[in-house]
Amino acid sequence: MKKPGNEEKSILIVEDESAIGKFCHRVLSKHGFKVNIAGNGKIAQQMLEKGKYDLLLVDIRMPVMDGVELYRWLNKKRPQIARRVIFTTGSVLGQETLNFLGSTGKPFLLKPFSSDELIGLVKKL
């Protein structure tokens, strides 16, 4: 059953791992959010050019265009949505990833994450 109050909020999931994208889509849709998935940052750019999203859930490491490049593009072209980004990343954080996350001040989820962790963080934003 969908949760009331989230029907008008749209979320773009930017994730190259199909299973994770589907999991996030299922959880967020169940809570009443309108959800779309982009398989990489380049596809996300195209979707952001055509549509409006209230929040982005962005994987840091992806082929074609990763989350770091997408975030830099957002800051230049879509600063409003750049403020409402949650990053996801694998459990092994290299120094470069830690530096990036620290510089953005954005929240992030370590994979694998639970549905409760995902919804809890989304609702905070």
Describe the residue ranges of each PLM region.
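Non-catalytic signal-transmission and effector/linker regions of two-component phosphorelay proteins
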Residues: M1-S10, S114-L125
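Conserved acidic carboxylate
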Residues: E15
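Charged docking surfaces used in two-component/phosphorelay signaling
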Residues: A19-K30
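Acidic catalytic/metal-coordinating carboxylates
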Residues: G39-I43, D66-R72
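Active-site residues of response regulator receiver
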Residues: D59
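Receiver (REC) domain active-site loop signature in two-component systems and cognate sites
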Residues: M62
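Alpha4 helix (beta4-alpha4-beta5 surface) of REC/receiver domains from two-component response regulators
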Residues: E69, S91-L110, D116, G120
